[in-house]
From Swiss-Prot:
The cytochrome bc1 complex contains 3 respiratory subunits (MT-CYB, CYC1 and UQCRFS1), 2 core proteins (UQCRC1 and UQCRC2) and probably 6 low-molecular weight proteins. Heme 1 (or BL or b562) is low-potential and absorbs at about 562 nm, and heme 2 (or BH or b566) is high-potential and absorbs at about 566 nm. Belongs to the cytochrome b family. This is Cytochrome b. A ubiquinone binds at H193. One of its GO terms (cellular component) is mitochondrial inner membrane. InterPro entries: Cyt_b/b6_C, Cyt_b/b6_C_sf, Cyt_b/b6_N, Cytb/b6-like_sf, Cytochrome_b, Cytochrome_b_C_euk/bac, Cytochrome_b_N_euk/bac, Di-haem_cyt_TM. It comes from Candoia aspera (New Guinea boa).
Amino acid sequence: MPHQQMLILFGLLPVATNISTWWNFGSMLLTCSALQVMTGFSLSMHYTANINLAFCSIIHITRDVPHGWVMQNLHAIGASMFFICIYMYIARGLYYGSYLNKETWLSGTTLLIMLMATAFFGYVLPWGQMSFWAATVITNLLTAIPYLGTTMTTWLWGGFAINDPTLTRFFALHFILPFGIISVSSIHIMLLHEDGSGNPLGTNSDIDKIPFHPYHTYKDILMISIMIITLLLTVSFFPDIMNDPENFSKANPLVTPQHIKPEWYFLFAYGILRSIPNKLGGALALVMSIMILFTMPFTHTSPMRSLTFRPLMQFMFWTLVATFVIITWTATKPVEPPFTTISQVASIIYFTFFMSNPILGWLENKITKHN
């Protein structure tokens, strides 16, 4: 009887008995989101969106504001933790066929794009050397768009170069986008619980479900605790581990850093961009590296949902993971051989995974029917 009442109370949350730890990342992302909003709100009270004062305001926060250094480092390292969780969440979705819940997957991919935009705007705000030059390089890609590119870039910058209006609007966007993320997250969660989550076997779990609370609540609390402990240990002992040394210097438009690169969580897309020696081609590849996730629900041809019983796609999946790491690594290196060649080969393999999905599904059908 208590279990029935609990199921009624959490009526939208009957969950498969066999979901593993890979299903805990949703609650971890929700925790990250709440942490980022709270620390970001605290930081915004002391931040000044002005090119002459932004860098000084960050120093003021870390030195003079009570516990400001904790807030600043929690926000910066929390962003990295957010992306670690979201990349693992996407990897789980690809492996276990979560993309077959079309609406949930499409809303989730939209969330990823919004999150990347928010993180990019946030990276510019300290107005350090790497912040300024990363913003210059990435926003300048808009000029590759035929006819409209130059006008769009001037509109985004608020002038003919990155200046005070650019920083002001980036701060405004960085502040407002998280509220959009929260709204789309709510839609994402509602869509997810309309169909119900999958399970490692990729089978229908309607006949074997248990209430979310208390069984999965404790699993979630355990993983959230591990994440928060890791975050606090990093903030306490290695607060600058994710920072670029160039960003400890104030932005100087007259001095170009030897090697311009964005934060680590954008390096895979940046590596794909750099691997193509053409501005428009590189910009298209950069956009497609994310947008190609939208195609997954429409290119699935296998009768099996999960990769658990699909060895060919399993091989391609782990190749994709290795490729992701390799592109991230090559993007930190100078644009010279052998790094350019490695990056180009890895980029081709990255897109091959998504293109091979329907072909390997069809091939597996043939092999299964033949046997």
